[in-house]
Curated annotation (Swiss-Prot):
PANTHER family the UniProt entry points to: PEROXIDE STRESS RESISTANCE PROTEIN YAAA, PEROXIDE STRESS RESPONSE PROTEIN YAAA
UniProt family annotation: Belongs to the UPF0246 family.
InterPro entries cross-referenced by the UniProt entry: YaaA
Name of the protein described by the UniProt record: UPF0246 protein FTT_1693c
One of the Pfam families matching this protein, by short name: H2O2_YaaD
Gene Ontology biological process terms, A to Z: response to hydroperoxide
GO annotation, cellular component aspect: cytosol
HAMAP family registered for this protein in UniProt: UPF0246
Length: 254
């Protein structure tokens, strides 16, 4: 069983205290091609491309132009699971997971990324900003199409080493579309979270993102390897709701 989640635009590069066996990014050649493309963009072009403020565009320009795709170590990079710090990662709280759970996560959790493609928890990453939905073409393909074959092939390879061949999709649609479901040789299971608002259940972005992190943590800490145990998730008031679920979707409501 492998979980996939989205990355986060917010990143924290404060050093971590615990020593781990860090790993290198999976798609180094593709990263070189992408970062070299991004380095062509001036500040004003980044502002328009990414629809961000002039100040943020300057920061992104600096990040990409100081990016060294041939060097990933503790001087310029940090393990991905401790670097991303958006809403999903607030739910995950990776810095409070014990060493054995982090090691387990290395084989059961993958983060999708516009720049890195697929990222394992202990892969070293440098600061960047490139959302999967960014309107940029690489080799004549939009970004998620550029990554699709590469990511799907790599996932199938990882699943060949897994006993339970289920992909738990906790990523957003923007990122999960970078996986070709038709070419994925395993079962695909979506998970959704809904809130009861005035008698109607709705998916609310900020709550759903944090819940994805909570679910990721729950699966990793409990070493869950089957769907029936996922249904037992009962954190932050969420409970499995069969009325909104089917064989390809588990929905949790509160």
């Amino acid at each position: 069983m492998i979980i996939v989640i989205s990355p986060a635009k917010s990143q924290n590069f404060e050093p971590i205290k615990t020593a781990y066996q860090f790993t290198q990014p999976i798609f180094k050649q593709q990263i070189i091609k992408l970062i070299n493309t991004l380095k062509y963009y001036e500040v004003e072009e980044i502002e328009k491309l990414m629809k961000i403020s002039p100040k943020l565009a300057e920061e992104v320009f600096a990040k990409h132009n100081s990016f060294n795709p041939n060097k990933y170590d503790n001087s310029n990079a940090k393990a991905a699971i401790f670097t991303f710090s958006g809403d999903v990662y607030k739910g995950l709280e990776a810095d409070t997971l014990d060493n054995k759970t982090i090691e387990y996560a290395q084989n059961h959790l993958l983060m999708l990324s516009g720049l890195y493609g697929l990222v394992r928890p202990l892969d070293l990453i440098q600061a960047y900003r490139l959302e999967m939905g960014t309107n940029i073409k690489i080799d004549g393909k939009i970004l998620h199409k550029y990554w699709q074959d590469k990511i799907t092939t790599q996932l199938n390879e990882y699943f060949s080493q897994q006993q339970n061949k289920i992909l738990i999709n906790l990523a957003s649609n923007e990122y999960s579309q970078a996986i070709d479901k038709k070419s994925l040789a395993v079962k695909w299971l979506d998970i959704d979270f809904k809130e009861n608002k005035a008698g109607a259940y709705k998916t609310i972005g900020i709550h759903a993102k944090k819940a994805r992190g909570l679910m990721t943590r729950y699966i990793l800490e409990n070493r869950i390897e089957n769907v029936s145990d996922i249904k037992k998730f009962n954190v932050a008031g969420y409970q499995f709701n069969p009325d909104f679920s089917d064989e390809n979707l588990l929905c949790f409501t509160r």
